[in-house]
Regions:
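Short, positively charged
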Residues: 1-55, 60-66, 71-264
Length: 264
């Protein structure tokens, strides 16, 4: 399966975030429905953006800031997935040492060699596969806790799933309302499954053999061409790093399992 590395998905998402932030600012009734509380007349809705925050929008009223993480579903909740994690920082841990080292080696050894793209892709896929094969339950839990559970819980970030096709917004007030958090409290044993037997850089995260729709992937954020320096220098994606994605598949199923969900 091919994934975009030109930034178009990100740009589309940001555009939607800006629109909704403006909608919340211009429609007090809508904003109050989203955060499920009364707002002051001088409340402020603001687009945050960037990659250093989990929240995409904030709504501030009477000294209280409501932080919102937005997941856009343009074709509806029954199609595709959304990202919980999409970060190269996750690969700084010891678990991904061999992956990082291979990227560094290939970046130098095959620099500018266009005919080596597929060879390097295979090398990286094989190493990603081996890394995922070797990951323990505690290592996976460490990734989920550090990059999903703690940021959402400690910063009190709510989750909005924006179903554009049906003009509905699903509001989840806390990570504590999710099935993932229930498994976190029980520290359910995790295994990584490869149902097709063919996936190299992707695994389904199973919680005591139960599939809740979470998938972990180890990918290059800008593609192999960028890694080898054979993209145009004018391109903003002129380099590539190993990146970890944790994606939520079966979004409709995820929503059904959330407690106290509100639909706006």
């Amino acid at each position: 399966m091919a994934f975009r590395t030109d930034g178009s998905s990100h740009k589309s998402g940001v555009k939607r975030e800006v629109k909704l932030a403006n909608d919340f600012q211009n429609n007090k009734v809508l904003a109050e429905a989203i955060v499920n509380t009364k707002l002051s007349t001088d409340y402020v809705s603001q687009h945050i953006g960037g990659t250093t925050h989990k929240e995409d929008i904030t709504i501030t009223s009477n000294g209280t800031t409501h932080k919102i993480s937005l997941k856009k579903k343009e074709k509806g909740i029954c199609v595709g997935s959304f990202d919980w994690i999409n970060s190269s920082k996750v690969t700084s841990s010891e678990v991904f040492k061999e992956v990082r080292e291979l990227y560094s080696e290939c970046r130098v050894k095959y620099h500018g060699e266009k005919d080596k793209v597929e060879h390097v892709r295979k090398l990286i896929n094989d190493q990603s596969n081996q890394t995922l094969e070797n990951m323990t339950s505690e290592q996976v839990w460490s990734i989920l806790e550090k990059n999903i559970i703690n940021p959402y819980k400690n910063s009190n970030i709510m989750l909005l799933i924006d179903d554009i096709s049906s003009n509905k917004i699903y509001c989840i007030d806390s990570i504590k309302e999710t099935e993932l958090y229930d498994h976190y409290l029980k520290r359910t044993p995790i295994t990584l499954a490869n149902p097709s037997g063919k996936a190299k850089s992707s695994r389904v995260i199973m919680f005591d053999e139960k599939n809740i729709g979470l998938r972990i992937r180890v990918v290059s954020n800008n593609g192999i061409g960028a890694l080898l320096g054979i993209k145009k220098k004018s391109s903003s994606n002129s380099n590539s790093k190993p990146t970890v994605k944790v994606q939520q598949d079966n979004v409709s199923g995820f929503i059904k399992k959330c407690k106290n969900i509100r639909v706006v």
